[in-house]
Amino acid sequence: MGRSPCCEKAHTNKGAWTKEEDERLVAYIKAHGEGCWRSLPKAAGLLRCGKSCRLRWINYLRPDLKRGNFTEEEDELIIKLHSLLGNKWSLIAGRLPGRTDNEIKNYWNTHIRRKLINRGIDPTSHRPIQESSASQDSKPTQLEPVTSNTINISFTSAPKVETFHESISFPGKSEKISMLTFKEEKDECPVQEKFPDLNLELRISLPDDVDRLQGHGKSTTPRCFKCSLGMINGMECRCGRMRCDVVGGSSKGSDMSNGFDFLGLAKKETTSLLGFRSLEMK
């Protein structure tokens, strides 16, 4: 709840104070002092509110108030205090005994302000008018900072691709195979960063038969599948490498340089070999 009003506004007088009301207020304060302004009007027999009685006493009926116009000394003191304190009229009135804050404010707006303008002084800043106007013009206009969100996008350079043409020729054949290889160069490889010892280069090597054909100029005749397994019995192999005769449990070969080793069961010390028919599974 807010503060209750100081008096009943329906039964109070408004407007200018009469001489009789002034005499009653002065007589009561001289006899009893100021006291509480809320209860003073009823005790003094006045149909006024407490605020009205207080302002009437402070601004007009106090015995220490100065009557009459302001002197030149008071004018200069008000100008000096205003340059230091600004529009704080209650503080200025405290330095001028016998003058009220309301009286000083009215006197400033009606007389002293006009006096300063005639002297060429700005009443607000207390500086020469030309200097104050020049300082206001020289002040740069403060622009509101514009916030911009910048997004930096960096594109990695495209990997360089190098092409190499290679041709492979096989002896005994007139055909040539041309191979086109691509090589990519990347600036950064995340796999190499994690595993520096890992080699990811891919190479294409020639077949074993081609290496044997090209190696040291030697010509060798490959063996057929049956001959390599030793499954020829008393027959001439088509490759012409060897002839195998199986007699009983032993096998004799006409050419043992290549070895008749079926499933790795040949004896290296002797020339007698085990036949694959006489093996028993254990």
UniProtKB/Swiss-Prot annotation:
Pfam family, one: Myb_DNA-binding
GO CC field: nucleus
Residues of the HTH myb-type domain: 9-61, 62-116
Induction: Down-regulated by exposure to UV-B light.
Family annotation (SMART domains): SANT (SM00717)
Main localization of the protein described in the UniProt heading: nucleus
Record's keyword annotation contains Repeat: yes
Biased composition regions of type Polar residues, renumbered to the chain: 130-145
Protein name (record): Transcription repressor MYB4
Name of the coding gene: MYB4
